[in-house]
Amino acid sequence: MKTDAHKNVQKKVGEKAGLIDEKTKENYFTIEVTNATLASECTPRVGSAPLAPTRSIFLILDINATLAADVADKVGGDPEESYMPLVAETFSVATEQGTPDRNVTSETAWGCFDDSVLLPPVVNPGQTVTGKLVLAVEVTQGRVAYDPQENGGWSWPYGD
């Protein structure tokens, strides 16, 4: 298993990542970046004029995520509070110096696309969700990481 300098397991675009139940060896959470596109503008949620990034460029991710219905049984805790966050704040990119840039949100990135095509903010037990997530980034090539607890997650390439 190849990891980057920030303890994120490296994946290819289209390759699933996930958390595995040690007993059953089955995934109870999966996340997959199926496409990573750079864009100098996006279609707005409201209005018709395209939005431009306030940072260098938009990084538009197409993501699939699934959370098992019985996740609370596997990890313990309250089923009502068992979910995985999918908001922009759980993602980062590496700066040119190699440090994580967790400031990948912006008002214009949030304003991109209609809600019907956007990734929901969480995946709940028993759900599979699909959608776009727009990040505001400075670096046009590198790796985008999903690491909600900032202790090691997964990363996918972009801008290649």
Where would I find each of the regions flagged by the language model?
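Conserved functional micro-motifs across diverse proteins
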Residues: 1-160
